[in-house]
A protein has these predicted regions:
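Primarily secretory-pathway and cell-envelope proteins
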Residues: 10-112, 155-171
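A glycine-anchored, Pro-Gly-centered beta-turn/N-cap motif
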Residues: 142-150
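Extended, solvent-exposed segments with strong compositional bias
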Residues: 106-135
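Surface-exposed coil/turn segments at beta-strand junctions on protein surfaces, enriched
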Residues: 72, 131-133, 146
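Bacterial N-terminal signal peptides
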Residues: 1-3
Length: 171
């Protein structure tokens, strides 16, 4: 007699790409993609202009906490462009500051836009799931479970910052 283990219980569910490519999604407990709400970040940096000198400042989101609460292991999905010079939105750790949430940002001399301080970036394991031309539907999974705290997924558009918080699991 030969016993063949079932692989269906061991396989991870991979969602199909949703119709709206502009949103950022998480997978709920019923394996449905739920979109994260966006907030608007502000910064004293003039991100639309070429910086005359390198300066460090911040991106700020109003309010002490995000309204969205996720589990530390919740899976994040989004669409991004796959071509040289483009990077997917960044998953970053936010710190509280006088009733708001902030992340350090840098404007580099001679370049328009901003960069996030590398110490605040949560290094993900990107996993491409579907490709259509230059566009890729991907999963961003942190390398380790997220610690309790405030997080944001930040791309180039400061009016479209997805935020969430992770709270400590109840024992």
């Amino acid at each position: 007699m030969i016993w063949v283990p079932s692989t269906s219980a061991q396989q991870e569910f991979l969602p199909s790409p949703p119709a709206d490519h502009s949103l950022i999604y998480v997978l709920d407990q019923q394996n449905k993609l739920i979109s994260l709400p966006f907030e608007t970040a502000t910064t004293p940096l003039r991100a639309e202009q070429v910086a005359r000198s390198t300066s460090t400042s911040y991106l700020e989101l109003k309010g002490e906490h995000s309204a969205t609460v996720l589990l530390a292991t919740q899976r994040i999905f989004l669409f991004t462009i796959d071509r040289g010079g483009a990077h997917p939105p960044l998953l970053v750790w936010l710190t509280p500051h006088r009733g708001a949430r902030r992340v350090p940002a840098i404007a580099q001399r001679g370049i328009a836009g901003f960069a996030i301080s590398s110490s605040e970036i949560v290094r993900p394991i990107p996993r491409g799931l579907a490709k259509n031309g230059d566009e890729v539907f991907m999963e961003l999974r942190p390398r380790v479970s997220l610690m309790p705290g405030e997080y944001a997924i930040i791309g180039n558009d400061l009016t479209r910052v997805a935020t969430f918080r992770v709270i400590a699991a109840a024992d």
